[in-house]
């Protein structure tokens, strides 16, 4: 079905709005993919907050014109599905994960931070943990010293409660008394 000029302008405006806030765009060829599989891909993309759409390449080129994603225009040939995301890795992750299980979906290229990515770079980007996972890992690393310190204080308090003086604390006192005697 062909779109009239007003419909084309509306599509370009919609995609331009998505691209304006996006961090990543990934394009993949979907030649021969079954409708049921494409529906599953769309559901996964929706769950991850990724905008996924099959577009006419000319309309997509016009939407990215003048943006950081303009370099991707040279890769926009053939039947493509466009994956656009505000999250840096979500678009690459959705497309790459689906391409692992469905050989008819072939990652073609991507663009992140104004740089065009080839298939290998998109796959590498997809293997990076999501923002939430990275934040959880950083928080975990920040809490390790605090947890170790509190365990040490708890052990010290337990020894004092038993009436024992910790060996480490007793040695410096002995050294001070020897130094005072000389």
From Swiss-Prot:
One Gene Ontology CC term in the entry: large ribosomal subunit
Keyword Mitochondrion: no
GO biological process, one term: translation
Keyword Magnesium belongs to the record: no
Signal sequence, renumbered to the chain: none
Keywords: Ribonucleoprotein, Ribosomal protein, RNA-binding, rRNA-binding
Protein name per the record: Large ribosomal subunit protein uL10
InterPro entries listed in its UniProt record: Ribosomal_uL10 (IPR001790), Ribosomal_uL10-like_sf (IPR043141), Ribosomal_uL10_bac (IPR022973), Ribosomal_uL10_bac_type (IPR047865), Ribosomal_uL10_CS_bac (IPR002363)
One Gene Ontology term of the molecular function aspect: structural constituent of ribosome
Subunit composition and interactions: Part of the ribosomal stalk of the 50S ribosomal subunit. The N-terminus interacts with L11 and the large rRNA to form the base of the stalk. The C-terminus forms an elongated spine to which L12 dimers bind in a sequential fashion forming a multimeric L10(L12)X complex.
Cross-referenced Pfam families: Ribosomal_L10
Designated gene of the protein: rplJ
Family: Belongs to the universal ribosomal protein uL10 family.
Lineage: Bacteria, Pseudomonadati, Pseudomonadota, Betaproteobacteria, Burkholderiales
Known role: Forms part of the ribosomal stalk, playing a central role in the interaction of the ribosome with GTP-bound translation factors.
């Amino acid at each position: 079905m062909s779109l009239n000029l007003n419909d084309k302008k509306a599509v370009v405006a919609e995609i331009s709005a998505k691209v304006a806030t996006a961090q990543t765009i990934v394009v993949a060829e979907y030649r021969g993919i079954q409708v049921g599989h494409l529906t599953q891909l769309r559901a996964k993309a929706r769950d991850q907050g990724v905008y996924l759409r099959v577009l006419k390449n000319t309309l997509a080129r016009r939407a990215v014109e003048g943006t950081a994603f303009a370099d991707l225009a040279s890769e926009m040939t053939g039947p493509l599905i466009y994956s656009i995301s505000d999250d840096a890795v979500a678009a690459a992750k959705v497309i790459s994960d689906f391409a692992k299980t469905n050989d008819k979906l072939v990652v073609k290229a991507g663009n992140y931070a104004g740089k065009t990515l080839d298939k290998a770079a998109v796959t590498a980007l997809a293997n990076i943990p999501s923002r939430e996972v990275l934040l959880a890992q950083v928080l975990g690393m920040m809490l390790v010293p605090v947890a170790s310190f509190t365990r040490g204080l708890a052990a010290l308090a337990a020894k004092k409660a038993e009436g024992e003086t910790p060996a480490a604390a007793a040695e410096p006192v002995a050294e001070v008394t020897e130094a005072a005697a000389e």
